[in-house]
Curated annotation (Swiss-Prot):
Belongs to the CheD family. CDD domains: CheD (cd16352). Disulfide bonds: none annotated. Gene3D superfamilies: 3.30.1330.200. It comes from Desulfitobacterium hafniense (strain Y51). This is Probable chemoreceptor glutamine deamidase CheD. InterPro entries: CheD-like_sf, Chemorcpt_Glu_NH3ase_CheD, Cytotoxic_necrot_fac-like_cat. The gene is cheD.
């Protein structure tokens, strides 16, 4: 029997099958899901910003450039093989825009771009993503199957 494990904002969790990882409220944030399909272990990070920059200390799960290393380390501790890791992501919306004015800061785009940079650096293929738009998402990640269910208001639900 599976448990649903909630991942909060600027948080990350790892688990083994048959558990499900879930995060809600993905606007400009990214939900990045990484798993090993053979060992059936994986994790999810709810990333808020692209880089930690010069911010000392703080929460490494908040930033794409620091969360990815931590997420992979924790998944490997569960018995995953780095060579088998695969990723999926969702989120990265442009939540605040005003007619006739340029998008403010484009945090969603920058978050998605930085996650891709980090995945390439780590040698982890991104299998599929559901990013962009102007709507929020809630995601459920099955670490056993690798299925990522993406739910949105007014845009339906899909499994990627």
């Amino acid at each position: 029997m599976s448990n649903v494990i909630s991942v909060g904002m600027a948080d990350l969790k790892t688990t083994k099958a048959p558990n499900i990882l879930m995060t809600a409220g993905l606007g400009s944030c990214i939900g990045i899901c990484v798993h090993d399909p053979i060992q059936k272990v994986g994790g999810m990070a709810h990333i808020m910003l692209p880089t930690a920059g010069s911010a000392p200390g703080g929460n490494p799960a908040k930033y794409a450039d620091t969360a990815m290393d931590l997420l992979v380390t924790e998944i490997l501790r569960l018995g995953a093989s780095k060579s088998r890791l695969r990723a999926k992501m969702a989120g990265g919306a442009q939540m605040f825009s005003f007619p006739g004015k340029p998008p403010v800061l484009k945090i969603g785009d920058r978050n998605a771009e930085q996650v891709i940079v980090e995945l390439k650096r780590l040698g982890i293929p991104l299998l599929v993503s559901d990013v962009g738009g102007s709507f929020g998402r809630t995601i459920h990640f099955d670490v056993g199957t690798g299925d990522l269910k993406v739910r949105t208001i007014n845009h339906g639900e899909k499994v990627i």
